[in-house]
Amino acid sequence: MNAARAGWSLLLAAGIGLSLWQWREATESPQRHGGHTHLHDDSGKPARLHAWSPADAAQVVLATPGASLRLRRGAQGWVAAAGQTADGFDAEEFLALFSQARSDRALVPQPDQPYGLTPPQLRIEVLDASGAKLASLDVGELAPDGLGRYVQVPGEPEIRIVPNYQTRAPLAAMAIAAP
């Protein structure tokens, strides 16, 4: 009977020890977790990159190192700037998706890793009627899993991974291959 009691006591102590270890790991900084962290809002959803409403957007600017496309909201909907075309790009649909863009992963940049952000493959900017930036995002390469894409909010030190579908339409509008 003493051996059984000792076995249960040992099992209980091991369970408490593992629980304390998990708690300690969860409270450490992201650098201790391979350089990444998972970001969530109070409801448990991945944290939004920006807080704005698509109704406030008056301009969308897509820029690559070699070209740019500027769309303005007009009385008839979204119109590309003079001399530019946005065939197949639905700005209204994109803004509805982009305004909810979420990232549940942030990475501390590693100097030996390619992210496609220097320079970015694409910069997305959303402006309001007065020209103030509602959102800005640099878009880089596809992540190794093929499902996410490296992005960076200008001015933030960390790199984030967002689902690739969130950037597929603007990449296609700028004729950048988007799997």
Where do the protein language model's features map onto the residues?
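A short-motif feature that recognizes glycine-rich, charge-decorated loops
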Residues: 1-179
